[in-house]
């Protein structure tokens, strides 16, 4: 599923960078990575849930990121980091992977190490780990 998360991150980043409406550029059947088996319905579903779910919940996701990253405005964050964070927050908060919350953070870190700046993975780990701790303690926003 790592490849699917990478493609979803790239789509989320692309939508944000191009400031386009998702309907204008989102075509689930036109994935550029030929190595992804888009005939597999569960892969298609996972990909679309990551992208569409992130944007459907963007206001809440951004609010959670703002609450944790007190000294960083979203506008100041690197767009790559922001796309990874948004997808990670969506996965932690809205997807039902109770037994693999740490794996979601690990995936985000791997993506940050490949696509982010030198220290992106540390920043992303800090934000997502803080969110997970808040969720586990019941103090994060609903």
Curated annotation (Swiss-Prot):
| A GO MF term | RNA binding
Q: What's the source species' lineage?
A: Bacteria, Pseudomonadati, Spirochaetota, Spirochaetia, Spirochaetales
Q: Which organism is it from?
A: Borreliella burgdorferi (strain ATCC 35210 / DSM 4680 / CIP 102532 / B31) (Borrelia burgdorferi)
| Descriptive protein name | Transcription antitermination protein NusB
Q: What does this protein do?
A: Involved in transcription antitermination. Required for transcription of ribosomal RNA (rRNA) genes. Binds specifically to the boxA antiterminator sequence of the ribosomal RNA (rrn) operons.
Biological processes annotated in GO: DNA-templated transcription termination; transcription antitermination
**Family of this protein:** Belongs to the NusB family.
List the InterPro entries: NusB-like_sf (IPR035926), NusB_fam (IPR011605), NusB_RsmB_TIM44 (IPR006027)
Q: Which CDD domains match?
A: Terminator_NusB (cd00619)
Instruction: Provide the gene name from the record.
Output: nusB
Keywords recorded for this protein, A-Z: RNA-binding, Transcription, Transcription antitermination, Transcription regulation
HAMAP family, sorted: NusB
Which terms in the GO cellular component ontology are assigned?
cytosol
Q: Where are the transmembrane segments?
A: none
């Amino acid at each position: 599923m790592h490849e699917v998360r990478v493609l979803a991150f790239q789509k989320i980043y692309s939508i944000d960078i191009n400031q386009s409406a998702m309907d204008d550029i989102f075509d689930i059947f036109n994935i550029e990575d030929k190595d992804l088996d888009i005939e597999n319905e569960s892969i298609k579903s996972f990909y679309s849930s990551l992208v569409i779910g992130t944007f459907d919940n963007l206001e809440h996701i951004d609010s959670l990121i703002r609450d944790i990253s007190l000294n960083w405005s979203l506008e100041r964050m690197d767009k790559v980091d922001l796309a990874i964070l948004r997808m990670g927050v969506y996965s932690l908060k809205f997807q039902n992977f109770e037994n693999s919350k740490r794996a979601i953070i690990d995936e985000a870190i791997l993506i940050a190490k490949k696509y982010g700046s030198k220290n992106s993975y540390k920043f992303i780990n800090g934000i997502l780990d803080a969110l997970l701790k808040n969720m586990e303690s019941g103090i994060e926003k609903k």
